[in-house]
UniProtKB/Swiss-Prot annotation:
An annotated Gene Ontology molecular function: kinase activity
PROSITE patterns: PEP_ENZYMES_2 (PS00742), PEP_ENZYMES_PHOS_SITE (PS00370)
Residues annotated for phosphoenolpyruvate binding in this entry: 296, 332, 454-455, 465
The protein's name in its UniProt record: Phosphoenolpyruvate-protein phosphotransferase
Quaternary data: Homodimer.
Residues noted as binding Mg(2+) in the record, renumbered to the chain: 431, 455
Species of the source: Buchnera aphidicola subsp. Schizaphis graminum (strain Sg)
Subcellular location: Cytoplasm
Top-level taxonomy: Bacteria, Pseudomonadati, Pseudomonadota, Gammaproteobacteria, Enterobacterales
GO CC annotations, alphabetized: cytoplasm
GO process annotations (BP): phosphoenolpyruvate-dependent sugar phosphotransferase system
Remaining remarks: The reaction takes place in three steps, mediated by a phosphocarrier histidine residue located on the surface of the central domain. The two first partial reactions are catalyzed at an active site located on the N-terminal domain, and the third partial reaction is catalyzed at an active site located on the C-terminal domain. For catalytic turnover, the central domain swivels from the concave surface of the N-terminal domain to that of the C-terminal domain.
Cofactors, names only: Mg(2+)
Length: 570
């Protein structure tokens, strides 16, 4: 039995089709001065062909997944046509006298590797998109045929080293019952599209392509993270029963999507979605998100060769605000640094990047970046209910400085006769012990708090969650972290304000009742977690969850907390 990473839940039974992709090997070959123009033309012709293909895929994607998913390939086309990318490739061809193919591979691979260094899974997985674009461009430069999944005419479970977003967009559910890959993660566009298709998928198995051969019969059970090769009749029958139970459970959860998260004794909780771009809105709305609890704007800055302009940002924020139809959209300003690098910004190499020049610290030092982003957010606020969220705040002075900047920009926009929400709400991320400890001072300066449990846990426990030697110590259910969360929530309520949570803990089913009992006002999570969290809240008594919270807050160890959570009966 083989396992991997859940990309999209479900069960599939079928024969294997191995999708083999040969790596394109480009041997170093210097070109003559006379051939430079020829190679540059090869690049332009390859790009033109790639844009045409991606435009066709974009249209087909819109028809299959809905208009919102077209944005994935609009992004691909934008990167292909990016002036900085073009300039870098042409400069390499001209100055180093290398072929268009070699120059393209060098530049694209550099961008992909920069993204892979990022610990944030969502941004890290954008490397797959960059390589997808680069591979297409490279093949078109070299006149190599591109894989077309539309040619599959038998029912199969597709197995490959990886699947790119453009390949996933070609999946025909009539013939492709599910897919498994060696590479990939849960937040890649491939996984996101698989969830939109509701097709069973497991990624990140490392070596599934070496464990199976064509026509092997397999069971792909992504519910239990199991891949069973050539199973017995008994196992097939057992898994068929699991499939039936899952189908009925899924249908019941669908009914909850558009219901409110109201406890059995009438306490209402707001449930939101964390997103990275416009394509995620479709899944958020489909799963019943009442708001966007976190819009990670970093994605706008990644996978490109220059900072996004104010207008580019404005269009992105405006589209999301309009798509949410006046439901709250909390836009976090750029959270770059730490493990999120932007090659074109030449960020310094630091010994402790997570304790260094990152997030709001960069924005405050680079006022042109801050101003462009805040102006874009303010302008977009005329088209929906937008809130501003500042990350990595550790002092009252920072907030006051930022509020002055917002006010200055509001005056600017008025002079330019541009419309915006003059009463726009401003909040801060609580993701350091410093901000949690002085929450009583910070809350007087803002409208709301949003707890980022990923960084709060890391900083509170002094544990680098990306360090395999100590990652076992990273535990958001640690008594110290739970105490800080409770303190922050209570302080916000004392001042008549509210606290949300956008870290991974918000979507963790084990602690839903605990967070509810601690008084958390808003849970924001991955869209696919929303129906299940709503189900738990709707079955829970608020008063009983408060009793649970009181007991948990007295616990001295994580084990004691988990024991209390496991014993709690809804």
């Amino acid at each position: 039995m083989i396992s991997g990473i859940l990309a999209s839940p479900g069960i599939a039974f079928g024969n294997v089709l191995l999708l083999k992709k040969e790596e394109i090997v480009i041997n170093r070959q210097n070109i003559s001065t006379e051939n430079i123009k020829t190679e540059i033309n090869k690049f332009f012709n390859g790009r033109k062909k790639s844009v045409k293909q991606l435009t066709e895929i974009k249209i087909a994607t819109g028809e299959k997944f809905g208009k919102k998913k077209e944005g994935i390939f609009e992004g691909h086309i934008m990167l292909l046509e990016d002036e900085e990318l073009e300039k870098e490739i042409i400069n390499l061809i001209t100055e180093k006298k290398i072929s268009a193919a070699e120059a393209t591979k060098f530049i694209i691979e550099g961008q992909a590797k920069a993204l892979e260094k990022i610990k944030d899974e969502y941004l890290k997985n954008r490397a797959i998109d960059v390589r997808d674009i680069g591979s297409r461009l490279l093949k078109n430069i070299l006149n190599i045929s591109i894989v077309d999944l539309n040619n599959i005419k038998n029912q199969v479970i597709l197995i490959s080293k990886d699947l790119t977003p453009s390949e996933t967009a070609q999946i025909n559910l009539k013939y492709i019952l599910g897919f498994i890959t060696d590479l990939g993660g849960p937040t890649s566009h491939t996984s996101i599209m698989a969830r939109s298709l509701e097709i069973p998928a497991i990624v990140g198995t490392v070596n599934i392509t070496k464990k199976v051969k064509n026509n092997d019969f397999i069971i792909l059970d992504s519910l239990n993270n199991e891949i069973i090769i050539n199973p017995s009749d008994q196992i097939i029958n057992e898994k068929k029963q699991v499939e039936r139970k899952y189908f009925f459970k899924k249908e019941n959860l669908k009914k909850l999507r558009n219901l409110y998260a109201t406890t059995t004794d009438g306490h209402n909780i707001k449930i939101g979605s964390n997103i990275g771009n416009i394509q995620d809105i479709y899944s958020a709305k489909k799963n019943g998100a009442e708001c966007i609890g976190l819009y990670r704007t970093e994605f706008l800055f990644m996978g490109r060769n220059a900072l996004p302009t104010e207008n580019e940002q404005f269009q992105a924020y405006k589209e999301i605000a309009e798509s949410m139809e006046n439901k709250p959209v909390i836009i976090r300003t750029m959270d770059i640094g730490g493990d999120k690098d932007l090659p074109y910004m030449n960020l310094p190499k630091e010994e402790n990047p997570f304790l260094g020049w990152r997030a709001i610290r960069i924005s405050m030092d680079r006022k042109e970046i801050l101003h462009a982003q805040l102006r874009a957010i303010l302008r977009a606020s005329a088209f929906g209910k937008i809130y501003i969220l500042f990350p990595m705040i550790i002092s009252v002075e920072e907030i006051r400085t930022l509020k002055i900047e917002v006010h200055k920009l509001q005056i600017q926009l008025k002079k330019e006769h541009l419309v915006f929400d003059e009463n726009i709400k401003i909040g801060i991320m609580i993701e350091t012990p410093a901000s949690a400890i002085i929450a009583d001072h910070l809350i007087k300066e803002v409208d709301f708090f949003s707890i980022g449990t990923n960084d709060l846990t890391q900083y509170t426990l002094a544990v680098d969650r990306g360090n395999d030697l100590i990652s076992h110590l990273y535990n958001p259910i640690s008594p110290s972290v739970i105490q800080l969360i409770k303190q922050v929530i209570d302080i916000s309520h004392l001042h008549g304000k509210w606290t949300g949570m956008c870290g991974e803990l918000a979507g963790d089913e084990r602690v839903t009742t605990l967070l509810l009992g601690m008084g958390l006002d808003e849970f924001s999570m991955s869209s696919t977690s929303i129906p299940k969290i709503k189900e738990i809240i709707r079955k829970t008594s608020f008063s009983k969850s408060q009793e649970l919270a009181k007991k948990v807050l007295k616990a001295a160890t994580t084990k004691e907390i988990l024991d209390l959570l496991n014993k709690f009966i809804i």
